[in-house]
A protein has these predicted regions:
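Phosphate-binding P-loop
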Residues: 1-3
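Glycine-rich nucleotide/cofactor/substrate-binding loop typically near the N-terminus or early
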Residues: 52-82
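Phosphate/Mg2+-binding loops and adjacent switch elements
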Residues: 82-173
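Walker A/P-loop NTP-binding active-site region of P-loop NTPases
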Residues: 6-64, 132-136
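Short, surface-exposed connector motifs at secondary-structure boundaries
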Residues: 25-33, 163-167, 213
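Switch/connector loops and helix/strand junctions flanking conserved nucleotide-binding motifs
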Residues: 44-47, 63-66, 126-131, 177-178, ...
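Conserved beta-strand segments of the P-loop GTPase G domain that flank and frequently precede/overlap
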Residues: 9, 37-38, 121, 167-172, ...
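C-terminal lobe/tail of nucleotide-utilizing enzymes
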Residues: 159, 163, 174-266
């Protein structure tokens, strides 16, 4: 895998956090230098520690201070600016600006360490669109100068070559897949090169679901299996990967099992 920044996004409740943690665990177990990032939210520390998943925590205001400190040459002055009501309000009134600052922080880490891979548990699909679209919008606003040059560097990383891979996570319903396809088209329109649709919580993708076991399913599950099988067949050209519905006692068990699918052992 050549991507340095692997993004998981999608509607709420599709399982992008589970998949992004499983991807991170898989890369770690294969010997990669990898960090899990939950954008501007803090991860489940207990879960990450239990699975020994390394994580990078970013907070919006701290990232803004760090960025200004790099430009001004003084962390103290940057902190003073951040504390002014105007700048603090501006940062929260323009969410796209905050997205750019955090994305810039991630890219800076990746550029400083060529061995590093970051798996991003992205905000929900609407915020993820803002995150990538904002690089174009703010570039038009500024036109030239220091921030304009930083945006150029950011876009070179995001939209040139194969450094970024975006996984649009969807559930196995026709409507959800249509929405995922629209989201994929939007990301490609922004300039992203590698955008995949991955299906999660798929009943037919359970390895143990043999024809003999399918025949023993209760009627409602048998119907669900048939519908999902038809959906997978109808959209097979659009779906890059499918992940099974898992019944485990804990999220940690599900992450550990799903990591095997990323590693190719399933």
């Amino acid at each position: 895998m050549s991507a340095r920044l692997i993004v998981f996004t999608g509607k709420g409740g599709v399982g992008k956090t589970t998949l992004s943690l499983a991807q991170t665990l898989s890369l770690k177990e294969s010997g990669k230098n990898v960090l899990y990032n939950n954008f501007d939210q803090f991860p489940n520390y207990g879960l990450c520690d239990r699975l020994r998943i390394p994580h990078l925590d970013l907070e919006l205001e701290e990232s803004a201070v760090e960025y200004m400190a790099q430009k001004l040459g003084s962390h103290m002055i940057a902190g003073w600016i951040m504390k002014t009501p105007f700048f603090s309000s501006l940062l929260h009134m323009l969410p796209g600006l905050g997205h750019i600052i955090i994305m810039g922080h991630l890219i800076n880490r990746l550029e400083k360490d060529p061995t590093l891979t970051i798996v991003m548990d992205s905000p929900s699909s609407g915020h993820a669109m803002t995150m990538f679209e904002s690089t174009h919008n703010f570039k038009k606003i500024f036109g030239s100068g220091m921030l304009f040059n930083d945006l150029n560097r950011m876009q070179d990383f995001l939209f040139s070559g194969d450094k970024v891979s975006v996984n649009v996570v969807t559930l196995p319903t026709e409507m959800a897949i249509h929405e995922a396809s629209e989201l994929k088209s939007a990301f490609l329109g922004f300039g992203l090169q590698d955008v995949k649709i991955v299906m999660n919580e798929s009943l037919p993708s359970i390895p143990e679901m043999t024809p003999e076991r399918v025949a023993l399913l209760p009627e409602f599950l048998s119907k669900k299996y048939q519908i999902e099988s038809q959906i997978i067949e109808s959209f097979k050209s659009e779906i890059t990967n499918t992940f099974p519905h898992l019944v485990n006692e804990s999220m940690a068990e599900s992450i550990t099992e799903l990591a095997k699918y990323f590693g190719g052992s399933k």
